[in-house]
Regions:
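Short beta-strand/loop motif that positions the catalytic acidic residue
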Residues: 456, 462-464, 468
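Alpha/beta-hydrolase-fold enzymes
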Residues: 129-162, 299, 303, 317, ...
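Amphipathic, low-complexity, repeat-rich surface-exposed segments
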Residues: 1-216, 228-229, 266, 479, ...
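Alpha/beta-hydrolase fold nucleophile elbow
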Residues: 294-314
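Short amphipathic alpha-helix adjacent to the substrate-entry channel of hydrolases
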Residues: 247-265
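Short beta-strand element of the alpha/beta-hydrolase
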Residues: 228-239
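Short alpha-helix in the alpha/beta-hydrolase fold that links the catalytic acid
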Residues: 472-482, 493
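Alpha/beta-hydrolase active-site loop
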Residues: 277-301
């Protein structure tokens, strides 16, 4: 069927209707402002804190956007006008299908949803509440908005309907099967789990487990160079994830890179908590983790000191352990590297919104003495921070379209969650996110001594990621003022994981350098120089500047006191969280 374009007279008549509508809207706006006492917005006698003034402003904006929306929709449907222009967030792929733009029905649904979303966000932004409450409101409103997206429902998603027609409903049958499987697992499947196996194509850098206790295994990696650094490197990964994020595979491994640069690399593999260790505390994690590992590494290598690297929560644990050593006047560290680590929890980003006094008190009452925080709960919490990408995307693809997830190593790692002992978790959340005690000298007692981070007098390399939603980079920047040693701060592009795992050979992303750490974070960034590619070579050069010389590479792993136990990656990393 051919649609005849409207005549010039019809378009002129349509325009007159539009003008009349705008005039009517203006009259309504004036009447509303008169009732609210805010006719002159510049001379608003009620002030910005007035609920009436707030409602009046919101009503004006609602009707303004409604008019623009229906104007564009009418022109598109009946007058051959241009498509309405909705502003999508960067990276929003929910409405990428052409039907959302080309078909008036779906465009109308999409535009209505986006308009309603914007109004909800505006309402929160204008709410007269304290900053913490506003951030919480913004977070929970976003959860609601994300959940109610028309792309999440089969009747309003053109891709789902098209797929069902093309497959004669087989996609819906497959989706139901996927849903049942995930209900049995207790989590959403986001990756083809059959494509990966720890020890086969993940965590494959050659090495040997040379020590273990009920909490950790310690891996010594096989040297790949004839000479190695005299001072060994101990890596402390986060205890809330499996360590192999740092050893994803050949060419995509920070561990492999460090070994190739001649470092003597040791790494802690944390055990996922089981009932037998559900009583372990924060102090146990320090004593049985990095403090014990440092002594084992020193005995095996004969070195007086070790370089230490901590990632995320592993960096927080390492820093506290270093402060314990400083308090006991035990000079066992040569340098520290902290990757996306928070020590000052003044600004914790969105994850801090999920940890309040009530939630911590509840955990303390239930698992504070003994018990387990399941890894699935931690994984779901982190997933809500990016619900569209980590939850709803897979609800649509797996359950509505019946698709099988792709093979992606990072998502496999992200799904391989770790459980924590209740006492350790409760101490950590109360003294970091809730009360921010660690940064204050002497405010916490750990391993029997008062902890003062400023007593850590070793050079420290600080890395943050510019788009990190878990450790805001400006929070990581403040660590330079807490640790007593000379600091170097580097800012990587991208987020919490991709900013860290960026092998030089891929020549991707960038990082920022500025030796002047005196300004505030924003001042530092504005004066920083952007460098293309990975930050890894900069870290390697920094490590070389703090080298104590090289020695012939050892030909055997372990020592008579700590003989080899089993090949890397060991048993602990393969254990699944219940």
């Amino acid at each position: 069927m051919t649609i005849t374009p409207p005549s010039a007279d019809a378009l002129e008549y349509l325009e007159s209707l539009m003008r009349a509508g705008r005039d009517a809207m203006k009259q309504f706006d004036d009447a509303l402002a008169s009732v609210a006492g805010v006719r002159d917005k510049e001379a608003n006698s009620l002030g910005p804190l007035s609920p009436i003034g707030l409602v009046a402003d919101l009503q004006r904006d609602v009707f303004k956007h409604l008019w623009q929306f229906w104007n564009a929709a009418f022109l598109q449907a009946f007058a051959g006008g241009a498509h309405s222009n909705a502003v999508l967030a960067r990276g929003d792929k929910r409405f990428k299908d052409e039907a959302w733009h080309e078909m008036p029905y779906y465009d109308l649904i999409k535009q209505s949803y986006l308009l309603g979303s914007r109004q909800l966000h505006d309402f929160v932004d204008r709410a007269q509440v304290d900053d913490k409450t506003k951030l919480q409101l913004r977070f929970y409103v976003r959860q609601y908005i994300d959940a109610m997206s028309p792309s999440n429902f089969p009747a309003t998603n053109p891709e789902v309907i098209r797929k069902a027609i093309e497959t004669r409903s087989a996609s819906l049958t497959d989706g139901i099967r996927n849903l049942i499987d995930d209900l049995q697992k207790g989590r959403i499947t986001r990756v083809d789990e059959s494509a990966f196996e720890v020890g086969r194509n993940l965590a494959i850098t050659p090495g040997t487990v040379v020590f273990e206790n009920e909490l950790i295994q310690l891996i010594q990696y096989t040297p790949q160079t004839s000479e190695v650094e005299k001072t060994p490197l101990l890596i402390v990964p986060p205890c809330i994830n499996k360590y192999y994020l740092l050893d994803l595979g050949a060419g995509n491994s920070l561990v492999e890179y460090a070994v190739a640069q001649g470092q003597q690399v040791f790494l802690i593999s944390w055990r996922s908590a089981v009932p037998e260790i559900g009583h372990l505390t924060w102090d146990n994690y320090l004593e049985m983790g990095p403090l014990r590992a440092v002594d084992v590494v020193r005995e095996i290598t004969g070195a007086e000191r070790v370089h230490a690297l901590g990632f995320c929560v592993g960096g927080t644990i390492l820093s506290c352990a270093a402060a314990v050593l400083a308090a006991k006047q035990e000079d066992k560290l040569s340098t520290m590297t902290l990757l996306t680590t928070m020590l000052d929890f003044s600004d914790t980003g969105e994850i801090g919104l999920l940890i309040d006094a009530a939630s911590v008190a509840l955990r303390e009452a239930t698992i504070g003495k003994s018990g387990i925080l399941p890894g699935k709960e931690l994984a779901f919490t982190f997933g809500t921070l990016r619900a569209n990408d980590l939850i709803w995307r897979y609800v649509v693809d797996n359950y509505l379209k019946g698709a099988t997830p792709d093979a992606f190593d990072l998502l496999f790692w992200d799904s391989d969650c770790v459980s924590l002992p209740g006492p350790m978790y409760c101490w950590y959340t109360r003294n970091t996110y809730l009360e921010n005690n660690i940064k204050d000298p002497g405010k916490t007692t750990q391993c029997g001594v008062p902890v003062d981070l400023s007593k850590i007098n070793v050079p420290v390399y600080l890395l943050a990621s510019r788009e990190d939603h878990i450790v805001p980079w400006k929070s990581a920047f403040r660590s330079k003022d807490l640790i007593g040693g000379e600091a170097r701060f580097v800012l990587a592009a991208s987020g919490h994981v991709a900013g860290v795992i960026n092998p030089p050979a891929r020549n991707k992303r960038s990082h920022w350098l500025n030796d002047d750490l005196e300004p505030d974070p924003q001042g530092w960034f504005e004066a920083a120089q952007e460098k293309p590619g990975s930050w890894w070579p900069d870290w390697d050069a920094w490590m070389k500047r703090h080298s104590t010389g090289t020695i012939p590479a050892p030909t055997q792993s372990g020592s008579p006191q700590y003989p080899p136990i089993e090949p890397a990656p060991g048993r602990y990393v393969k254990q699944k969280s219940n």
